[in-house]
UniProtKB/Swiss-Prot annotation:
Keywords, comma-separated and alphabetical: Cell membrane, Glycoprotein, Golgi apparatus, Membrane, Repeat, Signal, Transmembrane, Transmembrane helix
Lipid bilayer topology: Single-pass type I membrane protein
Protein name: Trans-Golgi network integral membrane protein 1
Biased composition (Basic and acidic residues): 94-107, 161-178, 186-200, 220-242, 279-288
The Sequence repeat ranges on this chain: 131-138, 139-146, 147-154, 155-162, 163-170, 171-178
Region (6 X 8 AA tandem repeats): 131-178
């Protein structure tokens, strides 16, 4: 975070310092550039902002100003990369892809480079020195660094090819809603980022070199870049929506599986509930059995108590009334021995007399 904040502060300082430098360079360019240069540059087609590169004078002051401008542009590019954040990784990936382009594109770009090369050898030498100086911060963006004017068409051609490929691939991807996005589309998106980031550098140099004459052309080249920038987020949003739409069923399937799995825990909970209920019922049964046993035991115990109490009472009464009981038993025996004679017995005696 601290590094990014420092880069932002540097970019703000450079942005404030650039207008004054641009004015000075524009005045010096108007005074030193030959009158035929703007006509040549305006007559040549400008397909992209990367092709807008002008010749420079052979004086030492022009080269110093070029180096200063390039240093400032590199600082601005670094700040823009720091602000872009995660796009840097994608641009690095796209740069690696652009380095792997076939040799046919290099041959075609060299053929397109011939009409753009200047006629004067002095201007060629100055262009070579300027491109070699600029090749250090910006070289490697479009394959192997080439000195002289050959670096211009390679950058421009690579930008054209990447823009065409990106346009076709994004249209095809939008027409065909697929769940997986091919790496070509990713490279096309990153290739779109390239001209916008690369385009910032040559537009700044074109203003310093050609002055007022190329200001309109650079503005015109910036307009499609803005349009590309505005179209990029819309295409990115559409592709993101397609990706989300494609990933929704994929995400829904695990959700459905989770929903299917949810009855499992609920069923297990029900089983646990039934187990707990059965355990409770068993405990109740055991408690009832134990209570029944205790109640039976208690009932038997009370029966034993009652019988014991009755026996104690009988024994107590018998013990206290033993004399009466003995007398009653003995009287019965005595009565049997000494019983009274009956009337019949008396009648028999009288008859005998």
């Amino acid at each position: 975070m601290r590094f990014q904040v420092a880069l932002l502060l540097l970019s703000v300082a450079v942005a404030r310092a650039l207008p004054s430098v641009y004015k000075r360079d524009a005045d010096s360019g108007d005074s030193q550039n030959p009158p035929n240069q703007p006509s040549k540059q305006s007559s040549t087609p400008l397909p992209s902002s990367n092709q807008v590169k002008t010749t420079r004078p052979t004086d030492g002051q022009g080269q110093k100003s070029d180096k200063k401008d390039q240093d400032k542009t590199t600082l601005a590019a670094v700040s823009s990369k720091a602000e872009s954040g995660p796009r840097t990784a994608a641009t690095d990936h796209s740069l690696g892809d652009s380095r792997r382009q076939p040799e046919k594109t290099d041959a075609e770009l060299n053929e397109t480079a011939r009409p753009l090369s200047p006629v004067n050898p002095k201007l060629e030498k100055s262009d070579q020195s300027s491109t070699e100086d600029s090749g250090k911060p910006t070289g490697g963006n479009s394959g192997k660094p080439t000195g002289g004017d050959s670096g211009k068409p390679t950058e421009a051609g690579s930008n054209k090819a990447t823009e065409d490929d990106s346009g076709k691939s994004t249209k095809v991807d939008l027409d065909k809603p697929t769940s997986k996005i091919s790496p070509d589309t990713e490279t096309s998106k990153t290739d779109k980022v390239q001209p916008t980031e690369k385009g910032q550098k040559p537009t700044l140099t074109s203003k310093t070199e050609s002055g007022e004459t190329l200001a309109g052309d650079s503005d015109f080249s910036l307009k499609p870049e803005k349009g590309d920038k505005s179209s990029e987020p819309t295409e990115d949003v559409e592709t993101k929506e397609i990706e989300e739409g494609d990933t929704e069923p994929e995400e829904g399937s695990p959700l459905e599986e989770e929903n299917e799995k949810v009855p499992g825990p609920s069923s297990s909970e029900n089983q646990e509930g039934t187990l707990t209920d059965s355990m409770k019922n068993e405990k109740d049964d055991l408690y009832k059995d134990s209570s029944g046993n205790t109640s039976a035991e208690s009932s038997h115990f009370f029966a034993y108590l009652v019988t014991a109490a009755v026996l104690v009472a009988v024994l107590y009464i018998a013990y206290h009334n033993k004399r009466k009981i003995i007398a009653f038993a003995l009287e019965g025996k005595r009565s049997k021995v000494t019983r009274r004679p009956k009337a019949s017995d008396y009648q028999r005696l009288n008859l005998k007399l």
